[in-house]
């Protein structure tokens, strides 16, 4: 294969959505698989919008996903600049070339003229399209319109007979009847380029070898092929990847939950999991394997294994996959990923010291196998950082109201208090509790369940002895004292009140 040069060219008008992220990923994987170049280009010709913040957001999302680029608007390259707003002179130059070659003409039709043409076509039962009336304008007619203050747009003369064939890597050959193609505008009346024109000029000038983009751009392709040929650029290979649909096969939207990369990030998904999931939206690895490292994706990725059928977005599958990564990634990586969540909750300082990070690592070790996201990990860890929690109501009724529960908790507390520091481990505390259970002649749950509730406020979570080991001796004793006092003040008083009524 010749040198691979691919690009991701977002319009910076908002967050990077998963459709765009998947397109960027497929381009990036293809480039890395073939040792080619991946280019980040901004399609920011709409100068009426404030795009700097949106561009920064897109860049941040790509970097968070681990997608890097070889050339781009923020790092330059041999074919820059890489912002369309900085390439207007090139577009004007190429437009002048089309005009000089007789392939384009000035169109003086006003928006009102065009609206009237569309309405006339609808009344005739025809598909509305520009009727080409300005193709044959005389010089005198043009001067008259310009004297009237009408600023023209530049249109390209599209072929009116024959067929334009799109050779798509995924969909095969698709023919478009040239009679259906409008004489498209390439330069607007305000002097700016249109999307189709700027896209072709940029792809041609930047020597893009493969245009890998979303299926919805397929209808633009025959027009762009005509422009490629008129301008004399080498035609890239076109690859239109399938749409991503909601589970009900409707268009994916906000009502289906998070759809933007920064939303998934805020919800506690790992970039490793999201990249893995996006790769499988439309691409088949040809095996039952579901979890891939980035290196495995780069080695395995092939456009020939991309389906032409719509991919179905399934947040349950993504959530499951995220849980797999939470369990399989190195401990240090999960600690790094959850840090901002813990800092936002106030559990970790802005510049944590080694002791804080060591404690966080032990919390993560205890909790991560029971959660699906970093946000869940943060929430499930709350009682490791706060002792002012409320006790679960059902847990109170089930475990704190049993006769003799305060005595049982006190015996467990005494056993923990006698353990030396070197024995205050998972194994050491479990052995101490087993001895108490044997001495009392009760079931294990009789001591373990109320102790869990006393230490965490919850009835489910990590193993009790993992909780004890993480909290440490001093904190465990304080929480057991608090629970014993709370039962005496609340449960026992409530029982006495019930008895008197």
Swiss-Prot record:
A motif ('KMSKS' region) lies at residues 251-255. It is found in: Cytoplasm. Keywords: Aminoacyl-tRNA synthetase, ATP-binding, Cytoplasm, Ligase, Nucleotide-binding, Protein biosynthesis. A motif ('HIGH' region) lies at residues 10-20. SUPFAM superfamilies: An anticodon-binding domain of class I aminoacyl-tRNA synthetases (SSF48163), Nucleotidylyl transferase (SSF52374). Its EC number is 6.1.1.17. GO terms for biological process: glutamyl-tRNA aminoacylation. GO terms for cellular component: cytosol. GO terms for molecular function: ATP binding; glutamate-tRNA ligase activity; tRNA binding; zinc ion binding. This is Glutamate--tRNA ligase. It comes from Desulforudis audaxviator (strain MP104C). The lineage of its organism: Bacteria, Bacillati, Bacillota, Clostridia, Thermoanaerobacterales.
């Amino acid at each position: 294969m010749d040198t691979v040069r691919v690009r991701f060219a977002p319009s910076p008008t908002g967050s990077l959505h998963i459709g765009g992220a998947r397109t960027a990923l497929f381009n990036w994987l293809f480039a890395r698989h073939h040792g080619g170049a991946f280019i980040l280009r901004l399609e920011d010709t709409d100068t009426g919008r404030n795009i700097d913040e949106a561009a920064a957001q897109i860049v941040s999302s790509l970097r968070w996903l681990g997608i890097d680029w070889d050339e781009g608007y923020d790092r330059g390259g041999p074919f820059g600049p890489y912002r369309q707003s900085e390439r207007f002179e090139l577009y004007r130059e190429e437009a002048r070339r089309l005009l000089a070659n007789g392939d384009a003409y000035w169109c003086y039709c006003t928006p009102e003229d065009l609206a009237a043409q569309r309405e006339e076509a609808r009344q005739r039962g025809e598909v509305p399209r520009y009727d080409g009336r300005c193709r044959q304008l005389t010089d005198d007619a043009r001067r008259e319109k310009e004297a009237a203050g009408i600023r023209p747009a530049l249109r390209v003369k599209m072929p009116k007979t024959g067929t334009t064939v799109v050779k798509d890597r995924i969909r095969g050959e698709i023919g478009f009847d040239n009679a259906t193609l409008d004489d498209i505008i390439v330069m607007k009346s305000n002097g700016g380029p249109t999307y189709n024109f700027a896209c072709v000029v940029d792809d041609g000038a930047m020597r893009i070898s493969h245009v890998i983009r979303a299926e919805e751009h397929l209808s633009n392709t025959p027009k762009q092929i005509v422009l490629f040929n008129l301008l004399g650029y080498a035609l890239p290979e076109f690859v239109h990847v399938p749409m991503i649909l909601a589970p009900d096969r409707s268009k994916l939207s906000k009502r289906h939950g998070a759809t933007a990369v920064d939303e998934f990030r805020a919800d506690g998904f790992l970039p490793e999991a999201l990249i893995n999931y996006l790769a499988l939206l439309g691409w088949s690895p040809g095996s039952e394997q579901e979890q891939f490292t980035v290196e495995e994706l780069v080695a395995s990725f092939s456009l020939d294994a991309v389906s032409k059928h719509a991919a179905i977005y399934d947040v349950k599958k993504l959530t499951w996959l995220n849980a797999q990564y939470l369990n399989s990634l190195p401990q240090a990586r999960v600690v790094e990923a959850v840090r901002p969540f813990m800092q936002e909750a106030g559990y970790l300082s802005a510049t944590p010291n080694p002791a804080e990070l060591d404690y966080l690592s032990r919390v993560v070790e205890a909790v991560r196998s029971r959660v699906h996201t970093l946000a869940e990990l943060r929430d499930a860890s709350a009682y490791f950082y706060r002792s002012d929690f409320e006790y679960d109501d059902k847990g109170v009724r089930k475990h704190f109201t049993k006769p003799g529960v305060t005595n049982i908790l006190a015996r467990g507390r005494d056993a923990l208090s006698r353990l030396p520091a070197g024995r205050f481990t998972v194994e050491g505390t479990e052995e101490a509790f087993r001895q108490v259970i044997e001495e009392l002649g009760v079931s294990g749950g009789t001591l373990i369940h109320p102790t869990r509730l006393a230490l965490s406020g919850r009835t489910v979570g990590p193993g009790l002895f993992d909780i004890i080991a993480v909290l440490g001796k001093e904190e465990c004793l304080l929480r057991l004292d608090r629970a014993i006092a709370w039962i005496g003040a609340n449960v026992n008083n409530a029982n006495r009140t019930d008895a008197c009524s």
